[in-house]
Amino acid sequence: MSRFKFVDIGINLTDPMFRGIYRGVQKHQDDLQDVIERAVQIGVKKFMITGGNLQDSKDALHLAQTNDMFFSTVGCHPTRCDEFEKNDPDHYLMELLNLAESNKGKVVAIGECGLDFDRLQFCSKDTQLKYFEKQFELSEQTKLPMFLHCRNSHAEFLDIMRRNRDRCVGGVVHSFDGTKEAAAALMDLGLYIGFNGCSLKTEANLEVLKSIPSEKLMIETDAPWCGVKNTHAGSKYIKTSFPTKKKWENGHCLKDRNEPCHIIQILEIMSAVRDEDPLELANTLYNNTIKIFFPDM
């Protein structure tokens, strides 16, 4: 058994890729169980399955109910906030609230919510701002921490966060790729910073990682997305590799599909960049996560 313990705070296990389906076409057999097994082998103890909208949150919860290690989030991603307006916004919010309220114990966070100004083609700035703020009602009512998203929107994100900070018990800004100053401002609000492959692309990203105290960090894969590519600045620190094929083969990882087992690679990059003992850092990351998302453990 692995000497490491991990909570993958951001894992998209409802993604059809883990069922062998790519762009609606079945390319290989459903291998979700193998994916989970590989992750458990390297020490993943809990998987926080991300909910990206109402339906996705229902699917994430449904999956979470199949395994004691699975948990989920309830919320609406900034790029999908149009859904509030396509429906009755209050009713949509109420459905999210009911889903979270009636499944405490499995639902451990409100999210994924926040702002994403890199992808305004999916949802306008005004709509994102409005429904990010609206979702604080969910955290306020449920007393659950938030799983937050901030892309190219730091000033507006901070503004909304500051205004509503007393309405949420805390949370993490996941997949962080901002500046040292941005990280410091978020930490000033008592928020944690989540790192995955997308957070480790450039030397500047690595410098930001060094600047954050370990007791404010969390770790994630965001799989099947955000894998560490060879072109990423962090990739040179990876020690652990997995048997990987370009075409699916039983018992192997698939080249362009990130998996939760790759969380060990994120740890290796983080500990090398920060010059910290990997086991010590892993324990700190694990304890940070338990404190915020699993306080009754």
UniProtKB/Swiss-Prot annotation:
Cofactor binding comment, as recorded: Binds 2 divalent metal cations per subunit.
Binding site for a divalent metal cation 1: 112, 222
Gene3D superfamilies tied to this protein: Metal-dependent hydrolases
Main location as per UniProt: nucleus
One Gene Ontology cellular component annotation held by this UniProt entry: nucleus
Residues carrying N6-succinyllysine: 27, 46
GO molecular function: 3'-5'-DNA exonuclease activity; metal ion binding
EC number: 3.1.21.-
Family: Belongs to the metallo-dependent hydrolases superfamily. TatD-type hydrolase family.
Identification of the protein by name: Deoxyribonuclease TATDN1
